[in-house]
Amino acid sequence: MDAAWRGGVGCSPVCLDLCVGLSPVREPSAARHELLDRPAGCRGGGDSKSMTNDEAKILEAKVTQMSEENRRLTEVIARLYGGQIARLGLDGSASPPRPVSPLSGKKRSRESMETANSCDANSNRHQGGDADHAESFAADDGTCRRIKVSRVCRRIDPSDTSLVVKDGYQWRKYGQKVTRDNPSPRAYFRCAFAPSCPVKKKVQRSAEDSSLLVATYEGEHNHPHPSPRAGELPAAVGGAGGSLPCSISINSSGPTITLDLTKNGGAVQVVEAAHPPPPPDLKEVCREVASPEFRTALVEQMASALTSDPKFTGALAAAILQKLPEF
């Protein structure tokens, strides 16, 4: 019976080989050849756990497709990072790129494109900054904002070394230094409302004219203009020395008259005092009016006013002609 068992049939009626699928490490072609080389009785044609030829072909096609995708992604990465590798002096053939998944390859390509765009934007900004001297740009939270720069010149006494320009705002000095192109030092001021107000001011004498003070303002005030204090120049006063309001008292008993000389065109504005003087005594007023000196002065004033008016002469002549009898 042992002899019949050994020689009667080509293989054992019970196949002891267990095939649960392809190993992820083994090549699909090798697994396929192994399945084909097995005896017919050991293939388990009806068993659901065995691998058929159709399933092997499908797996082989998937592996080929993934290999092709990896090859294309490797070429894209090589094109994107080829310039950086050449600048660093590295040899790409020494260390071949590792296979990456499609998701990671797309993410890297998107990041590299964003990096290239940011570099181009920075280079264009640096090139344009050399041509524009009146305005500067500052990056804040990923956005570019325009900073207003203005310059004001004031005529001062050459012996004055205070480097103070009175413009109506309050400033705090935080530094001073000497520059190469000007022997006069440059003073740095910050608005008194800082840090809420970002305006800064630089004051320095002109290198050509020592009596000219140049003030450079950076930024715009985000608060209303404070009221000018007594004795300070207004912000919009023109001219070399400016002008100040003055109070003139004509006499001790009369009203106080304020002359505002800061108006354009030399106009003078008369402003009466807020508190009027006490009313005069009626008896004294009546005595002054009844005096002959007052009457003489009144007649002279009226005569001078009438004779100075060119229309008065014509009206007087017309009235006289109407009263004359007709000849």
Swiss-Prot record:
<feature type="DNA-binding region" description="WRKY">
    <location>
        <begin position="160"/>
        <end position="226"/>
    </location>
</feature>
<dbReference type="InterPro" id="IPR003657">
    <property type="entry name" value="WRKY_dom"/>
</dbReference>
<feature type="coiled-coil region">
    <location>
        <begin position="56"/>
        <end position="76"/>
    </location>
</feature>
<feature type="compositionally biased region" description="Polar residues">
    <location>
        <begin position="114"/>
        <end position="126"/>
    </location>
</feature>
<feature type="short sequence motif" description="Nuclear localization signal">
    <location>
        <begin position="106"/>
        <end position="112"/>
    </location>
</feature>
<keyword id="KW-0238">DNA-binding</keyword>
<keyword id="KW-0175">Coiled coil</keyword>
<keyword id="KW-0804">Transcription</keyword>
<comment type="function">
    <text>Transcription repressor. Interacts specifically with the W box (5'-(T)TGAC[CT]-3'), a frequently occurring elicitor-responsive cis-acting element. Regulates, probably indirectly, the activation of defense-related genes during defense response. Modulates plant innate immunity against X.oryzae pv. oryzae (Xoo).</text>
</comment>
<comment type="similarity">
    <text>Belongs to the WRKY group II-a family.</text>
</comment>
<dbReference type="Pfam" id="PF03106">
    <property type="entry name" value="WRKY"/>
</dbReference>
<dbReference type="GO" id="GO:0009620">
    <property type="term" value="P:response to fungus"/>
</dbReference>
<protein>
    <recommendedName>
        <fullName>WRKY transcription factor WRKY76</fullName>
    </recommendedName>
</protein>
<dbReference type="GO" id="GO:0010200">
    <property type="term" value="P:response to chitin"/>
</dbReference>
<keyword id="KW-0805">Transcription regulation</keyword>
<dbReference type="GO" id="GO:0009617">
    <property type="term" value="P:response to bacterium"/>
</dbReference>
<dbReference type="GO" id="GO:0009751">
    <property type="term" value="P:response to salicylic acid"/>
</dbReference>
<dbReference type="InterPro" id="IPR044810">
    <property type="entry name" value="WRKY_plant"/>
</dbReference>
<feature type="region of interest" description="Disordered">
    <location>
        <begin position="88"/>
        <end position="134"/>
    </location>
</feature>
<dbReference type="GO" id="GO:0005634">
    <property type="term" value="C:nucleus"/>
</dbReference>
<dbReference type="InterPro" id="IPR036576">
    <property type="entry name" value="WRKY_dom_sf"/>
</dbReference>
<dbReference type="GO" id="GO:0003700">
    <property type="term" value="F:DNA-binding transcription factor activity"/>
</dbReference>
<keyword id="KW-0539">Nucleus</keyword>
<dbReference type="GO" id="GO:0043565">
    <property type="term" value="F:sequence-specific DNA binding"/>
</dbReference>
